[in-house]
Amino acid sequence: MEYFYTSQCPDMDHLRSLSVANRWLETDLPLGDDAKDVAALSEPELEFYRFLFAFLSAADDLVNVNLGSLSELFTQKDILHYYIEQECIEVVHSRVYSAIQLMLFRGDAAARERYVRAALRDEAIRRKVEWLDSRVAECASVAEKYLLMILIEGIFFASSFASISYLRTHNLFVVTCQSNDFISRDEAIHTSASCCIYNNYLGDAPRPDEARIHQLFAEAVEIECEFLRARAPRDSLLLDLPAIISYVRYSADRLLQAIGASPLFGAPAPAADFPMALMVAEKHTNFFERRSTNYTGTVVNDL
């Protein structure tokens, strides 16, 4: 062990620096301004967004139970420092999700608790958790565990983030959409970090072959798309389900390319009017390098 800092992983140090430059707090965003918009949602739409935020708020705990702390595998301080930054921003995400949940239940904390406990037993969420359970159990190497982390961070949140962003197209929940931009931006860094570690810092750990990689990606994308189809409100004008599903598949192909695998889905890039302000890791990086300070201003479309 070295008892002083030396740079060993400049790419991971760059990702840590991006995280530091874009720190934010739950107090930066006045979510109370969005409370008036709850009444603008139909009951099926309100149910859908309550469900999404129940999943997102619980996702970190569900993941950690299965994959544990991958940071314990490393001694390089750049990687350890990066993970400290990631843990700090995940605390902010958790607090923001809690505040949004409470807003969607009009301040009724008991109703929120009952709902979340029931939602976590829903088949759409259980399918994600059970898939992760089974794939962790059969992991042949730490590299495959990192593949699962890439899929969780890069695919299993994708339809939720996109669905939340559609509220912006109706001028609803402006601050919630801004927090969604920040959180999806943060998760893009987390996904990039997992890809970076997978590519560069797992030593001699055997990598899955491309057939196995494609199998895991195909399963994760199918589960994510079915998650959306199962819970999205019928006949709602808020969402464009085909566009979100195409976005999930496009995101999967970009991640495959990021780890040196061939694309699987051939989905086109999202249209210019797709409401996600930030969509892929490269765009996120460009956004971060500009260091946004407009926490309460207009969200920049960086497509």
Curated annotation (Swiss-Prot):
CDD domains: RNRR2. InterPro entries: Ferritin-like_SF, HSV_RIR2, RNR-like, RNR_small, RNR_small_AS, RNR_small_fam. One of its GO terms (cellular component) is host cell membrane. The active site is at 97. The chain crosses the membrane at residues 147-167. One of its GO terms (biological process) is release from viral latency. It is an enzyme of class 1 (oxidoreductase). Fe cation 2 binds at residues 90, 153, 187, 190. Its EC number is 1.17.4.1. Its cofactor is Fe cation. PROSITE patterns: RIBORED_SMALL (PS00368). Fe cation 1 binds at residues 60, 90, 93. It is a single-pass membrane protein. It is found in: Host membrane. Keywords: DNA replication, Host membrane, Iron, Membrane, Metal-binding, Oxidoreductase, Transmembrane, Transmembrane helix, Viral latency, Viral reactivation from latency. Its main location: host cell. Heterotetramer composed of a homodimer of the large subunit (R1) and a homodimer of the small subunit (R2). Larger multisubunit protein complex are also active, composed of (R1)n(R2)n. Ribonucleoside-diphosphate reductase holoenzyme provides the precursors necessary for viral DNA synthesis. Allows virus growth in non-dividing cells, as well as reactivation from latency in infected hosts. Catalyzes the biosynthesis of deoxyribonucleotides from the corresponding ribonucleotides. This is Ribonucleoside-diphosphate reductase small subunit. The gene is RIR2.
